[in-house]
Amino acid sequence: MTDASVRLTSPPTATAATRTLLIACGAAFIAFLDLSVVNIAFPSIARDYPGTPTATLTWVVSGYAVAFAALLTPAGRLADALGRRRLFLGALAGFAVTSLLCALAPTAGWLIAGRVLQGGTAALMVPSALGLVLAATPREKIGAAIGAWSAAGGFAAVVGPALGGALVEGFDWRAVFVINVPVTLLLIVAAARIPAQDGRLSAGALPDPLGTVAVALGLGGLVAGVTEGQRWGWTSAGTLTALIGGGLLVVAALVRSARHHEPAIAVDLWRSKPYALANATSFVFGAAMFAWLLSGPLFLDAIWDYSVLGSAGAMTIGAVASMVTATVAGRVGSPTARRWLGVLGALMFVACTVWMSTDAFGATPALWSAWVPAGVLGGGGIGFVVTVLGTAAAGALPPQQFAAGTGMNLTARQVGGALGVAVLAAVFAARPDDPLGAFHTVFALCAGIAAVAACLAALPVRTPSPSPDN
């Protein structure tokens, strides 16, 4: 890998850093919002395209998630190479255009294609935005910035169903996409004023194109295979092709990146033990977290017979707790204290999911006596863990690789999340006549996975002393 020549203007001011953080939080909000906002609109979409099989229409939901996870890693490398602000502005414009394409979709195929493109532009947007934040934020305040950024993304994922339900009931499913356009345009206007603080590689030093394509297709294949394996059949040709082919492409991209002077994957970052451990823990905890976030509203709907808006309101309890703990974790300066805060967060999540796997969460609704305290435990734990892991990963990155490093960290969490959701689907498929028992099993599995994450988070890792480039 060639040495990066970082072009910097004057040091960022506190005002510029705050403005950059607010813009990045807005971008995270809309990117993660669109992972979940369409779920509630799905029945309305299906009614508008009656001739399209349901199996095909599910790609309106999964197409975005697959493209998002597939492109996060190469997007981070591209942001560092092309310039983070440049890629961020282009991604915002692309997100607005693809949202409009989805809103105007005359056919299901058009809508699915629009969603895949929308997920791709979101993947370009997220690591470039976070890279801008890290470049504009003093090292001692990075934890607080990541805490705010994580809170915005987590809150979006939870309120997505409520917002989607309100838009569908008040207008039409197309409003779910239309609302992105003015929000994104406002972000473009604001982002154009971000100071040029981001690093750029020397002219022509773009990441290896072949390796970039390989890692994108490989991750996309793995996520698609894991996400759709239950529906396609785990031994079907489609699932095996996606999983085996995707795995081989990722391995090929890793081997090529280890030898290429401008690798598609920044494999050198994985030599940092704090960074590698943060990513491994993100992968494991992501599996438990995403399974819990999806099973929560399903439980409220199927077992306690809550309405869409009622379920969203109940889930907001955890989202608010997550925002509070993310803010608290971001203000902790000691690496040792942060590490134990991450362990505490994982154990809080374990306590929540163990509780939810018992008869306390039975057929009779128990909002105040069970759901609210469990939601505070689970959501609060997520806020601690996500912020601590994000700060640990960012703290191990040299400035010229901020976007590449955060992109891989987010990829680890998204791929782990896809695996967790696949486990959830497999449990429900195995117990179709016992939905309550299936939910209890899922919650127990979430607890076990989170316990593994707690053990990983507790491992002591010596943080290297900062160098002039780090």
Label the predicted regions.
Residues 127, 148, 153-165, 219, ...:
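Glycine/proline-centered helix-kink
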Residues 2-193, 342, 354-357, 371:
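Transmembrane-helix bundle of Major Facilitator Superfamily
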Residues 19-40, 237-242, 249, 261-464, ...:
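12-transmembrane solute porter fold
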Residues 30-41, 67-70, 84, 176, ...:
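Short helix-kink/termination motifs in transmembrane helices of multi-pass secondary transporters
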Residues 169-284, 288, 295, 306-307, ...:
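Hydrophobic transmembrane-helix bundles of small-molecule transporters
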Residues 45-46, 78-79, 163-171, 226, ...:
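Interfacial helix-cap and linker-helix signal at transmembrane-aqueous boundaries
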Residues 1-17, 201, 459-470:
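Intrinsic disorder in cytosolic terminal tails and internal cytosolic loops
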